[in-house]
Amino acid sequence: VVVLTSILRPMRQLHETMGVITDSPSDLELRSKIESHDEIGDLAVNFNRMMDKIQENNQMQMRFLSDVSHELRTPIAVIKGHMDLLQRWGKNDPEILEESLEAASHEANRMTIMINDMLDSIRVKGSFENHRNDTCDLNSSIRTVIGNFRVLHEDYQFYLNDFESSERPAQIYSQHFEQAITILIDNAVKYSPVNKEIQVTIKALEDEMLVQVQDNGEGISKEDIEHIFERFYRSDKARNRTTTQSGVGIGLSILYQIVEAYRCRIDVSSELGVGTRFDLYIPFADGETTTP
């Protein structure tokens, strides 16, 4: 009887834990507390490992949905901005018509690529693996992104300083680079509601290209700078950026993934009430590369 009880009790506990999770699938943090050193204990360990994987996959799906909703806002807004431009003047201006259609097509392609990359990520695949050897004409990509923001935010001034740039291709996929620059400029716009001037500077260094995005906005406190690349940073009130803007803070986290994937570097300097500057260093291409 004693032996039977020692077997049935932990089995009953494990069954109860399973029942709770079955009745409340959102409660994925529950784990078996059985610590016996026998087959039942091994079963409990495997059950907990299984729940760890299920919880991890669930979190990845939630991150995917959050990433998609965040990252698609800007290209959708760009397309809408160009369509509004067409409605106002494009019918009688072939130049505006061609520019807007080209921009809308470009952003639609970029959305497709972003979604595919995010799907790769949620499938536990490297979303950058297929583009390790791709190269990018940074000057052309930056002009494309700035052109989109000029249409989207007509009340802002976007300045491009490229007198120290280089025509050498950089070791990064063009769509991922444009996504990174879009995140930086979008961030600058959001936090510059008064002084609406954004400076983008390109400088060619010895082995890499430096792209700087400077705003004259609200700035970030020194205590908070070390956290800005964390996913959901802005949702944590203890580390909330000094702004009235709301959101979940996905953009800079995705930017950092791009930085790491292509062995880039990024530095941040900021002063409250003065502004923020992001310095993005992208290595020049070396060896066999492809330009999409």
Regions found by a protein language model. Name each.
Residues A188-V189:
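Short helix-loop "hinge" at the ATP-lid/N-box region of the Bergerat-fold HATPase_c
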